[in-house]
Amino acid sequence: MIGKLKGTIDEIGEDFVVLDVHGVGYVAYCSARTLAKLGSAGEAAVLFIETYVREDQLRLFGFLSALEREWFRLLQTVQGVGSKVALALLTTLTPGELANAIALQDKTSVARAPGVGPKVAVRIVTELKNKAPAFAGEMSASIGLKQELGEGVAAAPVSDAVSALTNLGYSRDQAANAVAAALKNGGEGGDSAKLIRLGLKELAR
């Protein structure tokens, strides 16, 4: 099994990169987000690799971090999510954004990924709710927000508030942290408009 490759970029295609490692060219399929962050041909690159072996083929998938690779594996535990859809999800959402979407049960954000219909989006946020790995840093905002939600806070206004703040240009982690702080400072039980207003105050500090 191949776990990691370090070499020189030989070619970048629409959904793959060819990495030259000591004269051997390895084709690794990547998310568009990963491909965009790689350098140009001739530059050095390191990829974390997930190796798929089938009866008729061997395919490599490349990631810039071990965290992204773990999410690739985790997403495919959901029925209806294969490697293509998993890469589409990782193109549309960062691992941190995925964590927040799952914590908030935000199926709308998940459904933005190509190939992810409403039913699959519901399965992803439902089935991974208790399975998503609690990686340090990437999961902090979602875990904090989940703790602030508790049992008595409606998820819909919270999700709407986070979405509204991201539409204003804030990152999903910033928005989630702001809404979590808003809940803590008197926003619990309020509607999305109140949470947005309090969230903006938190972001302005």
From Swiss-Prot:
Residues 144-153 are annotated as: Flexible linker. One of its GO terms (molecular function) is four-way junction DNA binding. Gene3D superfamilies: 5' to 3' exonuclease, C-terminal subdomain (1.10.150.20), DNA helicase RuvA subunit, C-terminal domain (1.10.8.10), Nucleic acid-binding proteins (2.40.50.140). Residues 1-64 are annotated as: Domain I. InterPro entries: DNA_helicase_Holl-junc_RuvA_I, NA-bd_OB-fold, RuvA, RuvA_2-like, RuvA_C, RuvA_C_sf. It is found in: Cytoplasm. Residues 65-143 are annotated as: Domain II. It comes from the Bacteria. One of its GO terms (cellular component) is cytoplasm. Residues 153-205 are annotated as: Domain III. SUPFAM superfamilies: DNA helicase RuvA subunit, C-terminal domain (SSF46929), Nucleic acid-binding proteins (SSF50249), RuvA domain 2-like (SSF47781). GO terms for biological process: DNA recombination; DNA repair. It holds the Pfam family RuvA_C. Keywords: Cytoplasm, DNA damage, DNA recombination, DNA repair, DNA-binding. Belongs to the RuvA family. The RuvA-RuvB-RuvC complex processes Holliday junction (HJ) DNA during genetic recombination and DNA repair, while the RuvA-RuvB complex plays an important role in the rescue of blocked DNA replication forks via replication fork reversal (RFR). RuvA specifically binds to HJ cruciform DNA, conferring on it an open structure. The RuvB hexamer acts as an ATP-dependent pump, pulling dsDNA into and through the RuvAB complex. HJ branch migration allows RuvC to scan DNA until it finds its consensus sequence, where it cleaves and resolves the cruciform DNA. Homotetramer. Forms an RuvA(8)-RuvB(12)-Holliday junction (HJ) complex. HJ DNA is sandwiched between 2 RuvA tetramers; dsDNA enters through RuvA and exits via RuvB. An RuvB hexamer assembles on each DNA strand where it exits the tetramer. Each RuvB hexamer is contacted by two RuvA subunits (via domain III) on 2 adjacent RuvB subunits; this complex drives branch migration. In the full resolvosome a probable DNA-RuvA(4)-RuvB(12)-RuvC(2) complex forms which resolves the HJ. HAMAP family: DNA_HJ_migration_RuvA (MF_00031). Has three domains with a flexible linker between the domains II and III and assumes an 'L' shape. Domain III is highly mobile and contacts RuvB. This is Holliday junction branch migration complex subunit RuvA. It comes from Sinorhizobium fredii (strain NBRC 101917 / NGR234).
